[in-house]
Amino acid sequence: MDSYLISIAGNIAAGKSTLTKALEKRTGGRIMSFLERVDYVKENGYLQKYYEAVSAYDRLKGTKLVGKDRNDFLKVKEAAEYWGYKIQETYFLSRLLDLGVLSELLREGQSVAQDRSIYEDQIFTKNSNNNEYITDEDYRRYLDLFKLVMRNKPTPDLIIYLESDVAALKSRIVGRSRGEESELADPGNSYLSNLNDLYRPWIMKCGFPYLIVDTEEIDFRTEQGLEQVVGDIIRTVPGTKDLFD
């Protein structure tokens, strides 16, 4: 049986881990769930520092500041740019290590459903550059590094994009109560909205077979919803049928 790499894509709290685990259970392990490794980022407090830094910068952007207030603003901007690049660099290196593990699993004939692939880094990095969390120079450096490093790396046989509206994402973030994400649920925080604006254009041009699953229309936590997703997977990549039989 051929092995397949299915990458689950989507905004924060879109349900990627949920679908990844559901596919593993549905196939009796013929598809192995491979969850995003974020322990290193969380243990070092990087994620919370990043969200705090960029949220502080967003609150001050566009205001007219002089004197001490202006100096304070520049410090906030500097912190946002530092953590903007730091967090992206850390995630990129972590996902690069994951690719090594995935390559071995695929060579051994194990199909994998992956919670967020390294290719989604392009969305988060572009968002950071758009919002001045990453300088133009650092953004160009990242793109050059990405192209160089990703040569001859395994590519997804299918990307499933879980599309969700921002209100639903914020509701899920509140519900799962992860402290480092609390800033994202604030009514005036536009971080999730900015990412959402980038996702659909990205998936349409990703260069891989893809599915778009509207999470407001399809609840894959239910048997009926999951079977609808499974049917769409098989229609898009017919070779995966044996995994679900």
Describe the function of each predicted region.
Residues 19, 23:
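Hydrophobic positions on the alpha1 helix immediately C-terminal to the Walker A/P-loop
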Residues 75-153:
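Glycine-rich phosphate-binding loop used to anchor ATP phosphates in small-molecule kinases
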Residues 25-86, 123-124:
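Conserved substrate/cofactor phosphate-moiety recognition/catalytic segment
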Residues 121-198:
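A glycine- and Lys/Arg-enriched "phosphate-lid" helix/loop adjacent to the NTP-binding pocket
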Residues 171-245:
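NTP-dependent small-molecule kinase module
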Residues 11:
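P-loop (Walker A) phosphate-binding loop of NTP-binding proteins
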Residues 16:
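Conserved lysine of the Walker
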Residues 8:
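Hydrophobic anchor at the beta1->P-loop junction of P-loop NTPases
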